[in-house]
Amino acid sequence: MKLLGHRKSHGHQRADASPDAGSKDGCRPDSGRTSGSDTSRGSQTTGPKGRPTPKRNQSRRHTKKGPVAPAPMTAAQARARRKSLAGPKLSREERRAEKAANRARMTERRERMMAGEEAYLLPRDRGPVRRYVRDVVDSRRNLLGLFMPSALTLLFVMFAVPQVQFYLSPAMLILLALMTIDAIILGRKVGRLVDTKFPSNTESRWRLGLYAAGRASQIRRLRAPRPQVERGGDVG
């Protein structure tokens, strides 16, 4: 009796499950139609799945910008193309003349820069304020000008006579202290004179003082631009 009852219940379950299966099978064609339409729409808008959307620069890269010459097949073709792109070849005399012209042009520019012409100066040296600072520095004797000669002399003596190093070190320290004091005095003097001569100046005293100290630390003959005033001259 239990087996018969079990079979009946199993049969009822099959009967109950058959309409559900039929309903599922009946829904499959509709789902297939909707999924097919969705994928077709997606492929039209976003492209195939699994690939990133191309960026604007990548899409432009693939577009043709114009006719492209074919690549050379031999070394002779490559040489011919390089010659055609390089233009006409200059002779030896023409190259020498071009080098001489460039050298003369550079020499002229340097001479005008050393003479202090405003159009050929470096950006740090341009302007009437910087010119006035240079004149102030060039019109006085500066202890900072001894920096390079004293440093070179110290190095030479230390390598030639190492025993004198013990006596030269304190002397160099004293000289460095004096040069520092001279740089401070020069910076204050330059700032005061610039404020008097150029009341509308907007450049800070600190920058002008550094510019003056840097020029004063150079040897007079090597200063660029060249000094326009003599030592002890009146700069106004």
Swiss-Prot record:
Composition bias type Low complexity, residue spans: 32-47, 67-78
Basic and acidic residues bias (residue ranges): 13-31, 90-108
One GO-annotated biological process of the protein: symbiont-mediated evasion of host immune response
Region annotated Disordered, chain positions: 1-108
TM region positions: 142-162, 166-186
GO CC terms of this entry: plasma membrane
Keywords on record: Cell membrane, Membrane, Transmembrane, Transmembrane helix
Domain of life: Bacteria
Subcellular localization, as worded in the UniProt entry: Cell membrane
InterPro entries listed in its UniProt record: DUF3043
Composition skew (Basic residues), residue ranges: 1-12, 52-65
Membrane topology: Multi-pass membrane protein
Major subcellular location class: membrane
Name of the featured protein: Uncharacterized protein Rv2206
